[in-house]
Each structure stands twice: as structure tokens, then as C-alpha cells.
Amino acid sequence: MKTKMITREGYNKLKQELDYLWKEHRPEITQKVSWAASLGDRSENADYTYNKRLLRQIDRRVRFLSKFLPEVKIVDYAPQQEGKVFFGAWVEIENEAGEVMKFRIVGPEEIYGDAKGYISIDSPMARALLKKEVDDEVQVPTPSGIKEWFINSIEYDKGQ
């Protein structure tokens, strides 16, 4: 089951996406569909077919966001989180081979588009890291076996 938590930044991005889709993009595509429909035969009208499909995709996303945003719990930074890994943390980890990774633990719906360096709170890596501290060793189950990582740093975006 997906966790229904989101960072303030993630919530604002999804709200902005919903506003854009509903107020700007959908009306634009609706106009194109109307124009293409006015040309007559719709069976071989590529503009009509393409824009109608695009309109369905927009409507699907708008329905999802309209339902999701009121139900989601926004998780803001709290000073009690300092020093431990919790939701919203930026975590840098390293394995014995010297491979270093840095990512932020966020809700599953925040991982889209240009969201680089984010992992879902529902992922095995995030689950293994929760409540750990700097210099702790973490064992993460993977398809190829258990992987060991060491926590180098934990940071939070405090300006949320």
C-alpha cells in the first residue's frame, strides 16, 4: 500500500500541476478538439483523435490529483527529526566499495518528471534507513542479496 504522505514542496508542485492542467492546458486542448471536430469526418481526423486522447489523459490526471490532494498528509520539518532519518530527509550513504549515493525520502507521488535524487518512503532502502543516525550501518534487502551501507550525513530542508 502506498503511503499517503507528502512534503510541503511536493504538495505545492502537485497543486500547481492541477491548477495548470485545469485552468490552462485543458481549456486549450478542449478548443483544439472542438476545432478538429468542426472539420467534419472524425474517423480519419488525426488532430481530433490525438487531442481527444490527450484530453482523456488530462482528465484522468485531474481526477487523480483532485482526489489525492485532499487526502494526503503534508509532513513538514520538525526539530525533533534532527540527527535521525525520517520522512523528507536528504541522506548520503556509502558502501564498502566507496560508492556514494545521496537522495531524499519522499512520498511515492513526488517521484515524477524532474524529481531526481528522490526515493519513495515505501522502498526497501527508505524503510531500512528510517530512524537511523549518522555512522549507522544499514542492511538493505535487494534481489541480489543483502547490501550494506553506512550513513554519512542526514539533512533536512528547514525552509518548508
Swiss-Prot record:
One of its GO terms (biological process) is regulation of DNA-templated transcription elongation. It comes from the Bacteria. Keywords: DNA-binding, Transcription, Transcription regulation. The keyword Lipoprotein does not apply. Disulfide bonds: none annotated. One of its GO terms (molecular function) is RNA polymerase binding. Pfam families: GreA_GreB, GreA_GreB_N. InterPro entries: GreA/GreB_C_sf, TF_GreA/GreB_CS, Tscrpt_elong_fac_GreA/B, Tscrpt_elong_fac_GreA/B_C, Tscrpt_elong_fac_GreA/B_fam, Tscrpt_elong_fac_GreA/B_N, Tscrpt_elong_fac_GreA/B_N_sf, Tscrpt_elong_fac_GreB. Necessary for efficient RNA polymerase transcription elongation past template-encoded arresting sites. The arresting sites in DNA have the property of trapping a certain fraction of elongating RNA polymerases that pass through, resulting in locked ternary complexes. Cleavage of the nascent transcript by cleavage factors such as GreA or GreB allows the resumption of elongation from the new 3'terminus. GreB releases sequences of up to 9 nucleotides in length. Belongs to the GreA/GreB family. GreB subfamily. This is Transcription elongation factor GreB. It comes from Vibrio vulnificus (strain YJ016). The gene is greB.
